[in-house]
Amino acid sequence: MTRGLRNNNPLNIRRNNTKWQGLAKEQTDKAFFVFVAPEWGYRAALRTLQNYHRVHGLMSIRQWIERWAPPVENPTDSYLKFVCEKVGMPADACPRISNKTIMCNIVAAMSHFENGVPAVMADVHKGWELL
């Protein structure tokens, strides 16, 4: 099992000062958040992408992936290509952050890239409902 799945943090959100809902009481991973269930990890990922749009003015899938997985530590181009192929959208598409289907598909594709296995869509949808 990958670290992201073990931590119920399928998109591998790094620890910082954010007090996410659904965090495990004991944060056993020094680098990445640990959530009590996968839907809370998906919720955090969805909220982060929405904040990229609302707070940082990042509108396109390309901008989101470049911020999420910067080239200094990730194969950003491969990540972007994988996500865009999975969701059937071009890299410069600007998805509506209020569109459940599109946002859940993007996050599911990101999870697949991060963990090497398809996301459990029921968990992704539960994450959306927790927003």
What residue ranges belong to the model's regions?
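Cell-wall polysaccharide-cleaving catalytic domain and substrate-binding groove, primarily
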Residues: 1-131
